[in-house]
Amino acid sequence: MSEVMDYKSRLSDPASRKFETFSYLPAMNAADIRKQVEYLVSKGWNPAIEHTEPEHLMDSYWYMWKLPMFGETDIDRILGEAEACHKANPNNHVRLVGYDNFAQSQGAAMVIYRGKTV
C-alpha cells in the first residue's frame, strides 16, 4: 500500500487554501468552466449562483445571487449571471451550484471565481 501524504494547505497561507473538489486541480479557464456548466445542464440540474466573503468561506451559509435558474439551459445566460455576480461582488468567492430535483440535493458545486484572500 502506498503512503498517504499530507497536503500542504494551511489557514496561515491564503494561497494554499482549498475550497472544494476542483480546487485541488489546476485552475479552470473559461473553456473548462463552460464544460462544467454544459455537464450540469445535460444532467437536468437547476443552476444557481452563490457568493460569500472570503472570511466566511467555511460557513454553511452562502448568499444566493437572485433565484435559482429553474429549467435554464442557456449556457451563456448561466455564465452571464455568474459574471454579473462576480462584478457586483469582486472580493467575494462565487460558486456555481447544480441542484438535482430528483435526489433533492446538490449534484455539483464549484467555486468559479475566487475572491480576495484574507
From Swiss-Prot:
One Pfam family in the UniProt entry: RuBisCO_small
Keyword tags: Calvin cycle, Carbon dioxide fixation
GO terms (BP aspect): reductive pentose-phosphate cycle
Stored InterPro entries: RuBisCO_ssu, RuBisCO_ssu_dom, RuBisCO_ssu_sf
Source organism, top-level taxon: Bacteria
Record-stated family: Belongs to the RuBisCO small chain family.
Biological role stated in the UniProt entry: RuBisCO catalyzes two reactions: the carboxylation of D-ribulose 1,5-bisphosphate, the primary event in carbon dioxide fixation, as well as the oxidative fragmentation of the pentose substrate. Both reactions occur simultaneously and in competition at the same active site. Although the small subunit is not catalytic it is essential for maximal activity.
Note: The basic functional RuBisCO is composed of a large chain homodimer in a 'head-to-tail' conformation. In form I RuBisCO this homodimer is arranged in a barrel-like tetramer with the small subunits forming a tetrameric 'cap' on each end of the 'barrel'.
Record-given protein name: Ribulose bisphosphate carboxylase small subunit
Organism, scientific name: Thiobacillus denitrificans (strain ATCC 25259 / T1)
Lineage: Bacteria, Pseudomonadati, Pseudomonadota, Betaproteobacteria, Nitrosomonadales
